[in-house]
Regions:
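Glycine-rich loop-to-alpha-helix module at the N-terminal edge of alpha/beta enzyme cores
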Residues: 38, 62-65, 78-85
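Short, surface-exposed loop/turn segments at secondary-structure junctions
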Residues: 66-67, 299
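PLP-dependent class I/II
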Residues: 1-12, 16-19, 28-33, 40-58, ...
Length: 400
């Protein structure tokens, strides 16, 4: 094959603007410099051995061939029961729930099944980096609005809020899909009941559908509850709900999640899903179905991660980083612009590179979650780590 073919008009790129992600770059840099990786969002502690045993038992029971395209009955029923118990919405496990190869596949498949060339899709930045490429592959047009960056008396970003005026202007007759993410990555911001009601008012007389990315649903802190799109009956009737077993049960490498949606929407979703991945790992589905029977495994997560958040925040308070609120998810954003070092004037990407190579702690620039980087001096740490890992990272960060 001609090596120049990939660069020629005969083989045009479907995603010409997409390069290597910042997550890959920072993880590689962390490995090269033996830095503590608090950049990419994955745990460094093991999952529950009971879950491993459940998957092992499924393998020994010969659950090793193709499962149903939509996922095994037992797991879909477990998901339906969980959503009903937590959020009060009844999804039919036969027609309204599909097991996916992770949340990202669920997101892409949902977009591909409903977005046609020329359709507009509204996203709220900073945003998970899979949204735009999926929209591009569907031929849609991304319409991005930015979270409002609230600033303190010194002009530093101190929190984020939903940009309702911009969101109102962005939704029109061409809008096919609105993507929301709660709890939010990277900021940890959460949508409230009043926010969902306001969103319902915006889309009520439109043909816009909703994609609600809720992969951090079990990581909401300080006694608050996750407000799912499923808890709002009107919005649930036009929404894809996306979640992730990998995030919930500390098994991100398994790449398994689920999507729930009304029957008409799920029918179209499954048409794409069957040719996108066809189906998902069989023994892991059986293991998760068994593990899901005990709700304590996810009901205990808020306290589990809040303890890690509090430990990490307490350590960061011994530095000159300004801590932003972290009400949910397993991320902590900080502002570095008041550090008493020359590097405090660097761009977010350059600061993260310096932090990794010179201090030995990897982080992610929040600017990377925008198509056009917005510099606000804010970076993201992941605290889904062993206490020893966090302690070692804090020891290094406290030298700043």
């Amino acid at each position: 094959m001609d090596q120049n073919l990939a660069l020629s008009p005969d083989f045009p790129s479907r995603l010409p603007k997409v390069g290597t992600t910042v997550f890959t770059i920072m993880s590689a840099l962390a490995a090269e410099h033996q830095a503590i990786n608090l950049g990419q969002g994955f745990p460094d502690f093991p999952c529950d051995r009971k879950l491993i045993s459940a998957v092992h038992a499924a393998m020994l029971a010969e659950h090793n061939q193709y499962p149903p395209m939509v996922g095994i009955t037992e797991l879909r029923q477990g998901v339906s029961q969980k959503i009903s118990t937590l959020y009060g919405h009844e999804y039919d496990s036969d027609t309204e729930i599909t097991i996916t190869a992770g949340g990202t596949q669920g997101i892409m498949t949902a977009i591909l099944c409903c977005v046609s060339p020329g359709d507009e899709v509204v996203i709220i930045e900073p945003a998970y980096d899979s949204y735009r490429p999926s929209i591009d592959l569907a031929g849609g047009k991304t319409v991005a609005v930015s979270l409002t960056a609230n600033r303190d008396d010194q002009g530093m970003v101190s929190s984020y809020s939903i940009p309702w005026d911009d969101l109102t202007k962005a939704i029109n007759t061409k809008t096919r899909l609105v993507i929301i993410n709660t709890p939010h990555n990277p900021t940890g911001m959460v949508w409230q009941k009043s926010d969902l009601e306001r969103l319902a008012n915006l889309v009520r007389n439109t043909n816009a559908l909703i994609l609600s990315d809720e992969v951090y649903e079990h990581m909401v802190f300080d006694g608050h509850q996750h407000i799912s799109i499923a808890s709002h009956p009107e919005l649930a009737e036009r929404s894809f709900l996306i979640s992730s077993f990998g995030k919930t049960y500390h098994v991100t490498g398994w790449k398994i999640g689920y999507v729930a949606a009304p029957v008409a929407m799920m029918k179209e979703f499954r048409k794409v899903h069957q040719f996108n991945v066809f189906t998902v790992n069989t023994p892991m589905q059986y293991g998760l179905a068994e593990y899901l029977k005990n709700p304590d495994h996810y009901l205990g997560l808020p306290a589990f991660y809040q303890a890690k958040r509090d430990y990490f925040r307490q350590g960061l308070q011994q530095t000159k980083f300004q801590l932003l609120p972290a009400p949910a998810s397993y991320f902590q954003c900080v502002n570095y612009t008041k550090l008493d070092i020359p590097q405090a004037k660097l761009s977010e990407a350059d600061f993260c590179s310096w932090l990794t190579t010179e201090i030995g702690v990897a982080a992610i620039p929040v600017s990377a979650f925008y198509a056009q980087p917005v510099e606000s001096g804010v970076i993201r740490f992941c605290f889904a780590k062993e206490e020893k890992t966090l302690s070692n990272a804090l020891e290094r960060l406290q030298t700043l």
